[in-house]
Amino acid sequence: MALVVKGKVNINEFIDLSKSEKLLPSMFTPVKSVMVSKVDKIMVHENESLSEVNLLKGVKLIEGGYVCLVGLVVSGEWNLPDNCRGGVSVCLVDKRMERADEATLGSYYTAAAKKRFQFKVVPNYGITTKDAEKNIWQVLVNIKNVKMSAGYCPLSLEFVSVCIVYKNNTKLGLREKVTSVNDGGPMELSEEVVDEFMENVPMSVRLAKFRTKSSKRGPKNNNNLGKGRSGGRPKPKSFDEVEKEFDNLIEDEAETSVADSDSY
């Protein structure tokens, strides 16, 4: 059962801050700065896609420091008439990890008949500022049995995250304060009632197959394909190059709201 968060993102949904941590200057507490990102949006045009998402949009990072992705709220809306069949699975991915089961941070399944949906994911791990600047997170989307002509957008997704920004990694205990949705590994969240379209396949398996398929076929409509070669088969693309073909799915400039930032 998914944990649904309605309205404004509430930091207390993810972090249990004591009164002293809220009142004391940051130098006297383990928490440097707790922030809520701006909204990033993905317009889904394909039945299966792997798109980059900026979960730290608008977050001021510390040079030479760290950022902990505590949690995020994902909102989705079907751009379809009522009572359509089919559904979707949405999975958050850390693209640095080569093993698919370790790359999947959480997934969610819902039917197209549920016009709007919202769920919470708690990754709760830190990365360096340098890695964060490389935009390491992706979203794997698998739409099944939604009959829409090619070139249209059946689904829109929006992402807002709660994170902790800090300079030094010497004080421990932050992870103990974070609300845990599931301590047994990557989450698989689902609605109580899901259309029969959904196959019993973990999202980590879908990710592994998608990566393999993408690396074999290479990006579409690439004008530089085979450039500098006299002929023959095009040179296979690396995984990093393949990822670029999905950049057009991201609407970086489309923001529906600007989230607040709270520092302690």
UniProtKB/Swiss-Prot annotation:
The keyword Transport applies. It comes from Tomato mosaic virus (strain S-1) (ToMV). Binds to host RBCS at the plasmodesmata; this interaction seems required for viral systemic movement. In resistant plants, interacts with host MBP2C at host microtubules; this interaction prevents virus cell to cell movement. In resistant plants, interacts with host resistance (R) protein (e.g. tomato ToMV resistance protein TM-2(2), AC Q71BG9) at the host plasma membrane; this interaction triggers host defense responses leading to programmed cell death. Residues 211-264 are annotated as: Disordered. Transports viral genome to neighboring plant cells directly through plasmosdesmata, without any budding. The movement protein allows efficient cell to cell propagation, by bypassing the host cell wall barrier. Forms a ribonucleoprotein complex with viral RNA. Binds microtubules and modulates microtubule stability. Can bind double-stranded DNA. Triggers host hypersensitive defense reaction in incompatible plants harboring resistance (R) proteins. Its main location: host cell. GO terms for molecular function: RNA binding. The keyword Phosphoprotein does not apply. The gene is MP. GO terms for biological process: transport of virus in host, cell to cell. This is Movement protein. It is found in: Host cytoplasm, Host cytoskeleton; Host cell junction, Host plasmodesma. Residues 237-247 have a biased composition (Basic and acidic residues). One of its GO terms (cellular component) is host cell cytoplasm. Belongs to the tobamovirus movement protein family. Coiled coil: none annotated. It comes from the Viruses. It holds the Pfam family MP. Keywords: Host cell junction, Host cytoplasm, Host cytoskeleton, RNA-binding, Transport, Viral movement protein. InterPro entries: TMV_movement (IPR001022), Viral_movement (IPR028919). Disulfide bonds: none annotated.
